[in-house]
C-alpha cells in the first residue's frame, strides 16, 4: 500500500484527486477536517440541504477563507455528481432513499462512489455495486467506518491463507436496549438531555447505536461484502473482551457461540449483569481466523497469540476506529488504485424491522433508533421467505395492521410508496432473488443459499 507515492505523482502532474461530498454532517465534517493536510486531495463541491451549514462546518473544522471561497456549495447531490471536475463522490447523507438516488446519479455520471451511507448499502448494495461494475466505476465502503475496516481484516486473513471463523465489531449491549426509545437514551450514555443538546447530539441517531439497529445494518453490509453468514435469528452480542475472541467466537462444539465458522457477530462491552468486560472492544473491530494446518497452529503458540482450546483459532483486532478522519483512504484507493475498500459481493444478510412494542394499525413507523421499531439481522433468504420489511424502508410509513411487540414487521404490514425509487429497487432485487432461486432449485436441486452466495443477481 503506497497511496502517498501515488498521490505525490498526482501533485507533480498538477492533477489532484477532486471529490464531491454529499452531506456535511458529523462523518463528512471529520473528513473535511483532514483534507487541508493531504496534498493532492481537493473537495471541489459540497452538497448539503443547508449550504450555509456546510460552509459553517468547513470553518469549524479549520478551513481558511480561501479554501471555503474556492469550494462550490450546492443544495442538491445531483450538482456534485454532474460537476465535471469531480472524480469521486462521497455519499454521507445517512438517508437510505437519498443515498440510493445519489449513488445512482454518481454511477450514471461515471464517478467512483464511496458510500458512507451504510443504511443505503444494507438496503440496496447488491444493486448499486452491480450497476457500478456495469459502468466501469468503483462502488466502495467508507474506510474509517467499521464495516470497511472489518472487510479489510477479512481480506487480510484470507490472503494470508487462513479461513475466517468470525468477523465483526464491539458495542455496548444489553437485551433490554432493543426497546429503548429516544426519550430515554441519554441515561445510557451517562449524559443529561441538556448536555447532549449542547453537544449537538441527535437522540434518535444515538439510540440506533444502542438498540441494536446500527449493529444489524453494519453487519449486513459486512456479510454482503465478505460473503459471510449471519445468525438465523439475529446477532447474539456475546460478552467478550479482546483476549477471549478466539475462544468465544468459534463453533459451539468447540465451546464457542457460533453455529458454524464463517459468521458475522457483534461482541458486547458489558456482561448481562451490567458489569464491564475486561479489555472490551466497544469501539473496535476484529477478525477470528483459523489455522489450516498444524504448523500454522504451532506458530500461533510460538508467537504468543491467544487461541481457543484447540490452538487453531486466533484473532486480530483494532481497538478503535476513526470514522471520517480515515475516509481519505477510501477516496484515494478508488481514485489511484481502482480498488474499493470493501464492496457488496452477495446478498447474505438483511437488517429488518421488529416491533419495539405493540403497534396499532394507522401508526407511522419512524425508522432506525426511533420509538416503534429496531433492526434485527437475519439471513437474506429468511427475509425473503418472511416478506420482512427492511429497516431502510421503515421510516415515515403507515402500518396497515396491528403488529405484536417483538414480531417482524412485513412489507405487507405497511403502505409503501411505489413511486419511491428505493422501494422499486428493493422490490426488483427481491423479485430477481426469488426467480433465480426457483431456477436453481429446479435445475440443480440447489438450496436458495446457493443463489444468494453465487449468482450474478445478488453479487451486486
Language model: regions and residue ranges:
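ADP-ribose/adenylate-binding Rossmann-like module
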Residues: 88, 95, 106-123
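Short catalytic-loop micro-motif centered on adjacent basic/acidic residues
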Residues: 45, 89-91, 113-116, 139-142
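C-terminal catalytic/substrate-binding lobe primarily of soluble NAD(P)-dependent oxidoreductases
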Residues: 2-8, 188, 192-443
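Rossmann-fold NAD(P)-binding glycine/threonine-rich loop
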Residues: 100-105, 118-137, 142-145
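N-terminal glycine-/serine-/threonine-rich beta1-alpha1-beta2 phosphate-ribose binding loop
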Residues: 1-105
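Short, ordered loop/turn segments at secondary-structure junctions
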Residues: 49, 94, 118-121, 144-145, ...
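Rossmann-like NAD(P)H-binding beta-loop-alpha module
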Residues: 140-210
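Intrinsic disorder/low-complexity segments
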Residues: 444-459
Amino acid at each position: 500500500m503506497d497511496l502517498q507515492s501515488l498521490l505525490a505523482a498526482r501533485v507533480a502532474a498538477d492533477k489532484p484527486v477532486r471529490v464531491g461530498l454529499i452531506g456535511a454532517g458529523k462523518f463528512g465534517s471529520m473528513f473535511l477536517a483532514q483534507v487541508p493536510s493531504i496534498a493532492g486531495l481537493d473537495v471541489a463541491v459540497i452538497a448539503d440541504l443547508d449550504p450555509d451549514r456546510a460552509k459553517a462546518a468547513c470553518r469549524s473544522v479549520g478551513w481558511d477563507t480561501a479554501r471555503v471561497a474556492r469550494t462550490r456549495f450546492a443544495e442538491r447531490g445531483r450538482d456534485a455528481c454532474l460537476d465535471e471536475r469531480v472524480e469521486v463522490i462521497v455519499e454521507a447523507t445517512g438517508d437510505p432513499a437519498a443515498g440510493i438516488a445519489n449513488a445512482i446519479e454518481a454511477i450514471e455520471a461515471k464517478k467512483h462512489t464511496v458510500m458512507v451511507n451504510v443504511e443505503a448499502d444494507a438496503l440496496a448494495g447488491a444493486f448499486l455495486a452491480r450497476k457500478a461494475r456495469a459502468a466501469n466505476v468503483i462502488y466502495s465502503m467508507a474506510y474509517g467506518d467499521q464495516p470497511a475496516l472489518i472487510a479489510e481484516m477479512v481480506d487480510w486473513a484470507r490472503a494470508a491463507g487462513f479461513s475466517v471463523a468470525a468477523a465483526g465489531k464491539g458495542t455496548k449491549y444489553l437485551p433490554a436496549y432493543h426497546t429503548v426509545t429516544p426519550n430515554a437514551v441519554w441515561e445510557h450514555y451517562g449524559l443529561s438531555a441538556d448536555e447532549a443538546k449542547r453537544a449537538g447530539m441527535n437522540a434518535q441517531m444515538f439510540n440506533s447505536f444502542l438498540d441494536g439497529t446500527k449493529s444489524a445494518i453494519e453487519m449486513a453490509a459486512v456479510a454482503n461484502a465478505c460473503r459471510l453468514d449471519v445468525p438465523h435469528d439475529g446477532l447474539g452480542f456475546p460478552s467478550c473482551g479482546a483476549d477471549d475472541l478466539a475462544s468465544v467466537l468459534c463453533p459451539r462444539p468447540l465451546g464457542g457461540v457460533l453455529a458454524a465458522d464463517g459468521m458475522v457477530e457483534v461482541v458486547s462491552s458489558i456482561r448481562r449483569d451490567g458489569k464491564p468486560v475486561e479489555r472490551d472492544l466497544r469501539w473496535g473491530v476484529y477478525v477470528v481466523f483459523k489455522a489450516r494446518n498444524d504448523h500454522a497452529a504451532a506458530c500461533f503458540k510460538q508467537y504468543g497469540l491467544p487461541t481457543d482450546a484447540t490452538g487453531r483459532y486466533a484473532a486480530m483486532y483494532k481497538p478503535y476506529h476513526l470514522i471520517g478522519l480515515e475516509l481519505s483512504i477510501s477516496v484515494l484507493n478508488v481514485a489511484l488504485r481502482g480498488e474499493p475498500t470493501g464492496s457488496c459481493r452477495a446478498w447474505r444478510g438483511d437488517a429488518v424491522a421488529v416491533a419495539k412494542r405493540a403497534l396499532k394499525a394507522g401508526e407511522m413507523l419512524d425508522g432506525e433508533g426511533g420509538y416503534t421499531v429496531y433492526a434485527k439481522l437475519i439471513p437474506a433468504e429468511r427475509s425473503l421467505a418472511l416478506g420482512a420489511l427492511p429497516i431502510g424502508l421503515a421510516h415515515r410509513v403507515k402500518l396497515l395492521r396491528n403488529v405484536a411487540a417483538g414480531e417482524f414487521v412485513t412489507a405487507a404490514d405497511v403502505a409503501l410508496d411505489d413511486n419511491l425509487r428505493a422501494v422499486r429497487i428493493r422490490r426488483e432485487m427481491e423479485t430477481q432473488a426469488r426467480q433465480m432461486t426457483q431456477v436453481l432449485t429446479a435445475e440443480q436441486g440447489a438450496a436458495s443459499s446457493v443463489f444468494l452466495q453465487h449468482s450474478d443477481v445478488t453479487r451486486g
